[in-house]
Amino acid sequence: AQDRSNVILYPTSYGAQHHDTEWLIGKGRVLDPTEWFIIIPNMFGNGLSSSPSNLEAPYGPERWPVFTHWDNVHAQRRLLAEVFGIEHLALIYGWSMGAQQALHWGAIFPDQVARICAVCGSARTSIHNRVFLEGVRATLTGDPAWTGTHFTAHPTRGLRAMGRVYAGWAMSQAFYREKLYETVGFTSLEDFLVRSWEANFLRRDAHDLLASLETWLASDISVYALLLGVRERALGAITARSIIMPSRTDL
């Protein structure tokens, strides 16, 4: 719209880049580009925005800064204002880490967000979620190429194992019990694990995956000075009309 009143921000999730999330966009789909101006910012650490795999010295695969959602949200705000001249968002839609970014937006810049739809996200990474993430990290860094600070080669063994561990958390018990993977083109459980989960992680840079994992672990909308470190204050700062959508079968 000429008045820029129809802007939707759609941040990326863990291990995803903008082209992985475009399936929601299309005429008659959840995000309809004939009605909305949709922007997908690539999260720091995802391999397209600043990430261990593309940082210049003194940073890089052997050393990188911790990216936080504070960084993501402030960079996105500058992108919107300085590139597109956008000061107000009709909606922020996000899944998983994208939902975390949506909630951060709502707490940090409440006057600039009209609506939030946060799917399978959280205002703060829970202890149970941290257990999952630490298990995934231990699996990946168990590869022989891990030195304690970085990988000396593409950690094929660790990435394959990471995919298999992640698959047990990402999909529900009912999904496996009912063999729903067979309804989306896979011939067996092994075929699903190899062609979906192993393949997805094998095409990623392992250092980028670790950097994004650190962002996930650090996610907490209440830690910033303006919110005084109080979760209730942070949540109370959100004035946007919000849909917080958990999954009934989520682990």
Predicted regions: what they are:
Residues 112-113, 118-199:
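Alpha/beta-hydrolase-fold enzymes
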Residues 1-57:
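N-terminal cap/lid subdomain of alpha/beta-hydrolase-fold enzymes
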Residues 195, 211-234:
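Active-site nucleophile elbow and catalytic-triad environment of alpha/beta-hydrolase enzymes
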Residues 238, 244-246:
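Short beta-strand/loop motif that positions the catalytic acidic residue
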Residues 92-94, 119:
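Short beta-strand immediately N-terminal to the catalytic nucleophile in serine-hydrolase-like folds
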